[in-house]
Amino acid sequence: MRTITRFLRRFLILLIVFVMGVAGTAFLMNNETTDDRSDMNNPTLPEVMVDFNGTLANRMYGYRQPMEADFVRDSVTPLDTTKKLTIAVNPYEEKIKSLSYEVRTSDGTKIVENRKVKSLDSSGSDGYLRAQIEISSGLLMNQEYSLQISLDTSDGEAYYYTRVVSRSSTNTEDYVKFASSFAQMCMDKNAADGLAAYLESAESSSTNFTAVTIQSPLSTISWGNLSPQISKKGIPVIKEINETTASISLKYEIKAANENGGAEYYNVTDFYRLRYTDTRIMLLDFQRSADQVFDPQQTVITDDGLLLGVRDKNVTMLSNEDGSVTAFTQEGALWTYAPDTGKFVDVFDFRRKSNGDFRDSRIEHDIKLLGINDSGDLDFMVYGYMNRGTYEGYCGVGIYHYDHDQNVVEERVFIPTSESFEFLKSDLGTLSYVNKDNQLFLLLAGKLYQINIDESTYDVLADNIDGNQFAVSATNAHAAWRISDGDQAGQVKFIDFDTLETRNDTPDAGQSLRVLGFMNEDVIYGIVLDGDSLTDENGHTTDGITSIRIEGFDGTVKKEYHQDGYYITDVTVGSTLMQFNLSEKTGSSYTVKNKDNIMNNQAAAAKVVSAEQSSTTRQGVIVKLAFDNKPETDEPLILTAKMKNTGEKTVQLDVDKSQISNIYYVYAKGGLDSTWTDPAQAILHADSLTGVVLNRAQQYVWERGNMKTQLTLNTEDVPEIIRSGSWDKDVLQQGLGDSGTVIDLTGCSLENVLYEISAQRAVIAKTGADSSVVIVGYDQYNTWLLDPATGEVSPYGMNDSTALFQAAGNVFISYLDNQK
């Protein structure tokens, strides 16, 4: 009996152990399968650079999908007469099977050449792989082409982009070395003394490391009292280069010790505009911005608020109603801060906490805060290049939700695009709004998209929208646009993105409407009577507005402005003020007689937190967040949010930009500055920034500082229709046909348009009410003018030419050869 009892006892014990083991295993397995929170994946893509005789330049980051060639212009790589390039690849942990390249026309429509390189040289001491490519196809001089480099890696294809251009005597290697050397010399006060000859320094009473220029004191350019060292060495990126000048951008990281010995990190961007001479390189322009990486482990909580450090004063931030949680962005990262508890959360950040490199720390993205609730839950949008994570190597728009209680970020939807960050940023600058039903609204390429986040679907609410006749409210919750086609053409449509309600305003007979903007959530539009849109003799149209209305979404007219005897022209709408001219009709144009404005009388909402600047001895000008009340604690609690794995939720939009043709891009100071529909205004703007202008096909329209000292065209090479001297643009375009595109340069100076002659393009210039000449040459003292009536070419003094063309209104017309 005792034996049976002992057996039963042992059996029960083993059974209990077995059941508990099974239950424990099931529990662990269940935890493993249901805990879908994790850290963001590390970057995997290799980097690609161009090796100029041992000097590296033009670092390229990989894309996981082919991009539209005409919407990626991160760097320009000059080709010499051999048309050979050495490509350097930093593989990191990836295995590279082969390299291939493809050369396309700058608009991306035609493949010029493509080849594959099977073997890469790994003998270099730096651990990089190298391949030499030789472009055998004939490339036009001074014309950009797109170069796509493809790597076949262990994780699939990766794509890299630069622009190549054949230029003579560009001195590329010297320019690149100068930029690297300049940045390094700034780290040593003694070495920095040798830079004084390159600068135009002036006295200054303050030090601001976010806005350093060639006029800044040498002490500021050499980092004042900060005493930093370079912690991540940059690789120069060529932004523009020609026979006379080059523009170089250099991004690097510096490290400095604070008052307590703690480490501070700063992202630095230097911009150099250089000219090569027989004796030395001249520094034509220099700009630097340094921005501190936020680190709450350092002393950042003070009685005066939260110290953000060295950065731009325009802080993207959002607080909930009682101010218990504030979200803010800094250097590509999103943080929340609770002043009552001292709690910081690193909500979203590509930058790794340790063992990072430029792949995770580069900032080719931006963050827009969409909403925050009383609990601290946060909705936000990340758009641009994704450094790491699920969508590493993609450019696009991601919508995210941060759950404060669970400390987890959930990706709601991702919208990939095939254009680089600077183009995407320009597109999203018009509209991006998410309503409470999780619907995202974007305006891209003339289409108004509604993306249904929960279903990963989208609808097109309207298309063929003229961006010049589209406006959004201060919150982006309302929009208005003039309908351009169909039965409702000419009507103005209003939409409330929260309710999706719409309504239309129809102009009365003999009137047309112009969308001017918004004041708060109220639309502003102008009424133009028939016959008051005047086209002058130079082909420029100006709307003479009779009345301006400010109207609520329900149709209530909040204000109407009208001045008897005057027309309203040149309207600009700001956040607090609308300004305009009061003009009189004079023949086929308007003459400004007075100015007026309308103030925004709505009181600004009280802010629970504001950004303020102060000055320090060591860091110079710094920025802090000031709160209504002193923070309760100066002891920080720092958390890092986890990413929730929800699977891939992507929406692919049918964005087609091929129909957009009359767009001109101004590049300056190392990036895309702005877009224009008027080439003359684009040139004037680029001139003020010492930049360049490219058209939709990425052809050079105008370059500052790249003009031959003298040149005369062979008149037989000038198209016959241009030699006619007509300033009727329609007639000129018809005469050029598919071979070229007319560009109206009216308003530019003679000095501006002589660039076109240097680029082998004649310019029609108006000289009187019914007369014109064709500029076909110039030298230091004269222009060379072709008489359309006789075909004779004769010199005319430069000063006399300037006066002649100015008296006629500076009416200039030229053309661009279409790519073949």
Question: What is each model feature region?
Answer:
Residues P43-E102, D107-V112, E144-L226, V300-K343, ...:
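Core segments of small alpha/beta cavity-forming domains
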Residues Q710-K820:
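Conserved active-site-adjacent core of cysteine acyl-enzyme catalytic domains
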Residues Y145, E240-K255, G376-V382, V523-V528, ...:
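A short hydrophobic beta-strand element
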Residues M1-V19:
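N-terminal Sec-pathway targeting helices
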Residues V19-T33, D70-T86, K97-S119, G124-D126, ...:
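Surface-exposed, charged secondary-structure patches
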Residues F350-N355, I415-F421, T457, D463-Q469, ...:
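Short coil/turn segments at the loop-to-beta-strand junctions that recur within blades
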Residues M29-M49:
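Ser/Thr/Pro/Gly-rich low-complexity linker/stalk segments immediately outside membranes or between
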Residues P339-G342, D403-D405, N452-S456, D496-L500, ...:
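Short loop/turn segments that connect beta-strands within beta-propeller blades
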